[in-house]
Regions:
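Alpha-helical scaffolding within the catalytic cores
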Residues: 7-10, 59-69, 152-171, 189-202
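Metal-dependent polysaccharide deacetylase catalytic core of the NodB/CE4 family, i.e.
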Residues: 50-141, 173-179, 214
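His/Asp/Glu-enriched short active-site or ligand-binding loop at hydrolase and phosphoryl-transfer sites
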Residues: 144-187, 244-248
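A conserved mid-domain beta-alpha-beta active-site/ligand-binding segment of alpha/beta enzyme cores
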Residues: 168-219, 224
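Acidic-and-aromatic substrate-binding clefts and catalytic sites of carbohydrate-active enzymes
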Residues: 29-35, 54-65, 129-138, 159-160, ...
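Active-site beta-loop-alpha junctions enriched in small/polar residues
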Residues: 30, 56-58, 80-82, 156, ...
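C-terminal domain-boundary segment and adjacent tail
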Residues: 9, 13-18, 150-155, 206-255
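Active-site beta->alpha N-cap acidic-glycine motif
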Residues: 2-74, 124-125, 214
Length: 255
């Protein structure tokens, strides 16, 4: 069973190797100001750790432009409407190739326009976060032509650039138990996921250059979720072999 001591021990191994493990934080499903979003932003301010917030453009309220304008906040596009277009036999997806690519391209372009309307030209990072972390290859290939230069899903990336001009940086630690009671997934699941990715990177079994991503969903959190985020940030920021990176640093604009 993985414990907080095990996480510290893994980071100690990074320190012994003279290396530093990079983390990043992505939070999904923002649509408007809520007490949960306020709590997330307050935690960000107190911790000093940057957060990338994935906004659903079709449902986004204009008030988000002001709420998410603070320091240490990057904004990503979370699909278009977070609507499932698969039939009942397949896993949920909005960006699957079982839809006409033209329809997907139109929606994503409309969503991108909505993001510019709310956040301005320089107020967000043109990175795509597919709903349910699912996107098929033909849709991925569309993204650079639509103006996106980043892609973020879940689990260790298979390629730094899944399409020319498109940088992938994924998340690896999902704190919500989606298949159970939809509360906190528990220390065993979350810490094991963190340690597994760190260990795989250190041992050359995963891309060492990919930051280890913490995935949260502020609207779904119970108290245990919030407690984990606080503790995870505390342990990592207090270790010399750990650092946190912003989405803007991880998804550079192509020159």
């Amino acid at each position: 069973m993985s414990t907080w001591k095990d996480l510290t021990a893994e980071l100690d191994l990074w320190a012994e190797a003279g290396d530093v493990a990079t983390f990043w934080w992505r939070d999904d499903d923002a649509v408007g100001p809520t007490p949960a979003l306020d709590r997330l932003l307050d935690l960000r301010r107190k911790s000093g750790v940057p957060v990338a917030i994935a906004v659903i453009p079709a449902n986004a309220q204009p008030a988000l432009g002001d709420v998410l304008s603070g320091d240490g906040i990057d904004i990503l596009q979370h699909g278009y409407a977070h609507r499932n277009h698969r039939d009942g036999t397949g896993k949920k997806a909005e960006l699957g190739d079982d839809r006409a690519l033209w329809d997907i391209a139109r929606e994503l372009a409309d969503g991108r326009g909505r993001m510019f309307d709310i956040f301005g030209e320089d107020g967000w990072t043109e990175t795509m976060v597919p709903p349910w972390n699912r996107i098929d290859e033909p849709v991925t290939a569309l993204l650079p032509g639509l103006g996106f230069h980043g892609l973020s899903t879940f689990r260790a990336r298979e390629a730094v650039q899944p399409a020319p001009g498109l940088t992938a940086v994924n998340t690896h630690i999902d704190i919500v138990d989606w298949d159970g009671d939809r509360g906190y997934a528990g220390d065993q699941a979350t810490l094991s996921a963190a340690i597994a990715h760190l260990s795989a990177k250190r041992g050359g079994l995963a891309d060492r250059g990919e930051a280890t991503g913490l995935l949260t969903h502020h609207l779904a959190h119970d108290d245990a979720c919030w407690a984990f985020i606080d503790a995870f940030i505390d342990v990592t920021t207090g270790h010399p072999a750990a650092q946190w990176a912003s989405a803007r640093a991880l998804f550079p604009v192509p020159r």
